[in-house]
């Protein structure tokens, strides 16, 4: 029941909550928005509880977007409330037009969940499609629990557009203030009250509600607004001085789907929500809404993060089944009896299903980490049952009955079973208390296995003995066929092993030397093996960023993007494409010279290349094929919500407020130095301080001499060139805004100012051109702040076969060498989390080893036995490093990342578990049976060889499918499989010699023979 009710997601809830604050300052440039809006808002938010960092972006379209990233584990709802409370204290400092627009605060994620393309068969325009989505789809999707926001990329939302003709304003001697006043008065909505309302006169019989004429809502009605009346009685209406149309609130974005107009619906989930549940709800709602679509309108899924999640979970389930089959095969090979095989086989469903049953209580979900834990648990949970069955069978072959054999066996194996279980718990439970993303990933993995191991141990001490007494029978004295040949072969190997062990354990210096060489080899390989955080995974889509030369028009960008789009669609591994021109997704701003293409790839089974390989190939192809634009493809980061791209994200900050020019110069110098480093593949930034602009120089003395109020002049320029918001109107059941701006032909270039006039307050129109001069200049398209410092964001991609960890170290070294004290650097997005987690792996390993040592010391009341057990751990670590290092020479994806670290923690427990089987039994034979130390050691090694080989190879075969996994999240499985197989192979093949040798070494150094004599005298 729990399995079917558990939520399915890519990762546990490890994404830091993000609260977004956004607003618009109509007509303002980036610097103005930054100074007037972003700075006061950022100052009010700074220091809010649980904040990690915040980044504000102010753009030339007047928009301000600020994202506050909070600590993992904080409550997103409370984060949003605290942020809103702080923002409210800054509202009084903001310009009036900003507060009129409203300042929105909402919790969201930076990574999108699903992207839909709404298209038609040619009957509808992009304007219609976008507004159909605004009116009929957006709010319905926002109602879904877990949906954070729904952005629509395409033609803007409807707005009443008043396109003024400045020369006609001058002709009719009408000021802008008169136009504003008329539209506000005649286009607004006003209450009227009641006739006979209370307190009423004594003779009032009825009360009537009074209504005014309904608010106007269409272009014709707005055009009929009376602006003024001439002395001759002629009325000047709005349509006489302006073109009025139902247009868009914002222009500048054009979207196409396979060359047809489209509206892109970008759906983001809320922090803490379940991706698959939210995605399924969104899909069901879209299917319901599509039944009401007008004829000719359809929708296509371009990006669906849930598809890769579900496919990845399905693949891991398949891996789990394959592992189960292989484990059963190896058990049957060694036990050679279906009855004996059945006993450990029953331990698997009991332990695995039992663990799933506890998932709801633990707050766990079915995700990549927990499922990988279950795959590895298959090889673990059979170990205890195998040890029991093997011991019982040995006793039965001595002539004991099944019941007596079971009782006798449990006397000898109960202690090792408890010990190995305690060791595994000592490894897994402490590391689950780590913080950060790393700690949360370790938590899901380690607790999943710990629960399975506990159930397995309980099963081995209760159910397995009962089944042994009921099911096991003496095996035939004479065996034939395959099993007979296998037993003869294994018997010879056991004799050879016993002989080799007898010769080996006597050389104490050799044993110590092997341990020392192993530790030295680990240090060398660890130093040279690249490190990283999380591998990039194939999510079924790529994105292509396209950028034309600075200041290019939207039409120029659309043409370039159509060329890129056409080339991308020709690839056989591409299913569909859809793009939005006029939007810079990397910077998060509207930009006429930028655009993004969503590329949906064909199913994983129908293509030979991963999304990363396709992105690399596209980047190379487009660089040559489309020289008129800069185009490069990229994939999303492995953890949704931590940035847009998968590269390294770095913020370069102006710590002393020296200005944009200073910061830009230092950043360019820094980037040039980075490009010379062998660890760096590419360095890019969306920031550019050299964008062609025009500056209007105002001769204030001349303007004032002509009686021009400067406030009126600035308002005139802001309104005519940038547009101004007036009021709202209702239509289609929604509230829309009214904007006033000069018609396009009156803001074509600097010569358009010749038709602009300002009223001097005495009825005279003063031409703007009489006291202004337009000069060419350069400036920025957007301004960024990071933690209140002016900043420039860099995206760095490591060179081939260089990990992100190596690249980040190189970046820090260059920054320390090149940048002055006035300029600082800091990480953001996934890079911030990686840097926070870096260095924690050593603490994890140390914590695991210390807890194992202390646990064993308490269990055995000895310092020597735990030391003998733990000195075998380096072999497993060396095996993992050798295998992963060899794989790295073939593929750069095999590095020391978090999956490698998880594997090493597991190997600490596994190698200690195998060592316990030999060391504890040798200790029993020596102290309880009074055998000679060397003889006890050799006998323990001989008797424990078969169960060690059986449990080790059942685990190795159980994780072997991970090495050969392909498809979704294959990289994570490949790395874990390689590390675990390598570690267990070396720990098994060499460990069976090292385990007894280490016990003998510790016993000799610790003078165990003297201790036994003292115990015997005391007794």
Give the ranges of each region predicted by the language model.
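Signature of alpha-helical transmembrane segments and their immediate interfacial
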Residues: 1-8, 413, 482-535, 942
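Flexible hinge/switch segments at interdomain interfaces of large molecular machines
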Residues: 8-19, 56-62, 97-122, 151-157, ...
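Extracytoplasmic/periplasmic membrane-proximal domains and adjacent transmembrane bundles
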Residues: 11, 22, 65, 91, ...
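Helix-loop junctions and hydrophobic alpha-helical segments within the transmembrane domains
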Residues: 302, 309, 313, 317, ...
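Transmembrane alpha-helices and their membrane-interface boundaries in multi-pass membrane transporters
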Residues: 378-392, 413-433, 440-483, 597, ...
